[in-house]
């Protein structure tokens, strides 16, 4: 009896674990290390609608809290700010900020915007967002050239910090 129980437990665990990792209906996940103007690469997870007959806006969240789950076959349980957004057909993008989790560079807590940059390679949160959106528009084929940024708490800080010298797509 205990062998049967063990076999059923193993089968059930493996079956439901594999089901939990299936792709999000209607989306394909890509991962990229996006180069910033100073050469630092930021880890980015991109969820693209499978329907390529339309062009979609980009909805970006930059976070110090991890954009896990990592791996192109591992999908977030929910895309966007809440479940209502999942049927709205955005290209959802999540990015680990500098020095956090899978991204390169040094993390600087609540870094202020730099009004005057000493060189074209000097960065702040606004320039990292700009470079990210520039890369996404150039490399994700079915985008419509528009982007939005959102966040609550620390990701909300990153959304606000992206506004000085913002990318024109925002």
List where the protein language model places each region:
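Bacterial Sec-dependent N-terminal signal peptides
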Residues: 1-23
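N-terminal cap/lid segment of alpha/beta-hydrolase-fold proteins
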Residues: 22-54
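Conserved beta-strand positions that form and line the central face of beta-propeller blades
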Residues: 33, 61, 146
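Conserved G/P- and acidic residue-centered "switch" motifs that form tight phosphate/ATP-binding loops
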Residues: 39, 99, 151, 155
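Generic beta-strand/beta-sheet core signal
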Residues: 44-47, 62, 95, 150-152
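Short alpha-helical segments and helix-capping/turn motifs at coil-helix boundaries
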Residues: 46, 77-80, 156-161
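Primarily recognizes the serine-hydrolase "nucleophile elbow" in alpha/beta-hydrolase
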Residues: 52-58, 68, 134-170
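Cap/lid segment of the alpha/beta-hydrolase catalytic domain
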Residues: 55-138
């Amino acid at each position: 009896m205990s062998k049967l129980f063990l076999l059923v437990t193993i089968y059930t665990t493996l079956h439901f674990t594999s089901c939990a990792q299936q792709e999000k209906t209607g989306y394909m996940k890509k991962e990229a290390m996006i180069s910033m103007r100073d050469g630092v690469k930021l880890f980015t997870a991109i969820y693209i609608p499978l329907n390529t007959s339309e062009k979609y806006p980009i909805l970006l969240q930059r976070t110090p809290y991890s954009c896990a789950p990592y791996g192109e076959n591992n999908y977030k349980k929910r895309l966007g700010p809440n479940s209502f957004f999942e049927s709205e057909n955005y290209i959802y993008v999540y990015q680990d900020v500098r020095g956090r989790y899978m991204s390169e560079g040094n993390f600087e807590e609540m870094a202020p915007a730099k009004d005057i940059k000493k060189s074209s390679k000097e960065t702040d949160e606004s320039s990292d967002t700009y470079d990210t959106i520039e890369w996404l528009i150039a490399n994700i084929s079915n985008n419509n050239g528009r982007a939005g940024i959102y966040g609550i708490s620390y990701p909300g800080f990153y959304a606000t910090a992206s506004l000085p010298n913002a990318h024109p797509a925002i």
